[in-house]
């Protein structure tokens, strides 16, 4: 794998906004990465289920807002992020990210075994 050159993320978003539409709404920025999934994720999304990862997940909000609903000790709690906000979600904690129209964020998580990460 060749080493990728740095790029301007804001420029990438401006040039690729059309790719960030439902039903998928996300794009893996480094398909060849060995350990991490680095995604730009846009809203809106209709996800209402909770899921969890075996490892931590980093949310960095670029545009608009996101609510990350979590289950903490059996109680529902909501983490609200706006532009410039960052949140490191703990491993093995159920969560449900909800993005509205106009929401764009960077999400970084470790790859899971047997995972297809093309998009």
Regions found by a protein language model. Give the residues of each.
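A short, N-terminal "cap"/entry segment at the start of jelly-roll beta-barrel domains
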Residues: 1-42, 47-49
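Short acidic/polar mixed-charge low-complexity motifs
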Residues: 37, 46, 66, 75-77
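His/acidic/aromatic-lined binding-pocket segments of jelly-roll/cupin-type domains
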Residues: 38, 49-52, 56-61, 78-79, ...
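Short, conserved beta-strand element in jelly-roll/cupin
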Residues: 41-42, 52-71, 105-110
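Short acidic-glycine-tyrosine-enriched beta hairpin
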Residues: 72-92
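Ligand-binding loop in jelly-roll beta-barrel domains
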Residues: 91-118
